[in-house]
Amino acid sequence: MEEKTYLKWYNKVGYGTGDIAGNVVYAFLSSFVMIYLTNTVGLNSGIVGTLIAVSKLFDGVTDIFFGTMIDHTKSKMGKARPWMFYGFFGCAITLFGVFAIPTSLGKTAQYAWFFIAYTLLNAVFYTANNIAYAALTSLVTKNSKERVQMGSFRFMFSFGTNLVIQSVTVGAVEMFGGGATAWRTIAFIYCIIGIITNTLAVFSVKELSDEELKDDSVAGEEDDKLSFKQIIKLLFSNKYFSMICVIYILQQLRASMVNVGIFFMTYVLLNKNLFGVFSWANNIPLIIALAITPTLVSKMKGMYKLNKYSYMLATVCRLMVAVAGYLGSVPLMLIFTVLTSLGEGPWQGDMSAVIAQCSEHTYLKSGKRIDGSMFSCTSLGVKLGGGIGIALSGWMLDISGYINLDNAVQPDSCINMMYFMYLWLPFIFDIIITVILSFLNVESANMKLKENMQNQ
């Protein structure tokens, strides 16, 4: 029997625009905050890395806290949409703050300014906004195909925004005259774009009522009666939740190393404009793969095999990027970057649907629905993995003797470190992700649970 549909095409597209907002924050921050802080503000990369690492201590708590708050929320807008809507205004203010550090302040005050703005952005406002956004996948439809389509639209906008930001930001900063004022202007423009697109996404969908979301075959405790301790226990008793958390963290660590490309292109390939070219090679294939992911899921009768085998392809191709890098062949690096991205695309497209299946797994086993808390893995992974990745890149550059000047000649130790960070670490992370995906067959587990219930 055909599943009931809940969404029109414009609901899915409108929902997807929310990741334009998410990426004017995340892509801008992860790609350019380190080079802005070191080369424009003049801060030490090692100290910046340490501050980011300390900031991450808050994230694990706030992720699950906001997930729980979403589960307990009851309003005319629903559970998640209020948090998504109001949370982004805080994102905009604090993102601007990160890229508007006054040059007149002393170094200690500049470090403090950055730490406060960065922590509020990540641990509070981005957390509330992003968990709510991800949770909408479970709250606006019960149709598994529509959930995959929502994920595909979302990440098409995500990678499209990532592509634009990585391609135009360096040139835009130069166009506005360079220096602190230019970075502040660019940040302001991105904040306005984010507010507009986030608002569009919030009002493009409507959450289903609690009655509509219930499965009559499952009886259990109401989610708003669960304690914080009970929710934590439910989350980590679901092995698939833990797997997805680890994958998300590894993906963001990998993305942080790929974003070291701005340093690799500047000091190894001696052409910083290549960063935009590689961004195209990375993001355009992802967008293409996302567009066909719903069809591939249908043809392969599920997400598990598609995710496993496509990521195997991505891992092999990323190894070839490293080989091409040591050969000094930019064309070969670009070709294998394209193939890597094509392999990564299906998982990016159906990731939200897999998390929704993960949430369904907890519901089928316990009778307790904790969608908001379950989707905390998305924000936790993005912020913890991304933050540690940026911190790690700062530490590794500092240890290798990085000189924070645009036209500096970097020592051999630093050049070798850039090779390791940009070429080898992404490959290592891809291997681990592929292994975890080979065990992430939550669809099959849910089918067995439903069959057992029907036979009882």
Where are these predicted regions, by residue range?
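Membrane-embedded alpha-helical bundles of multi-pass transporters/translocases
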Residues: 2-456
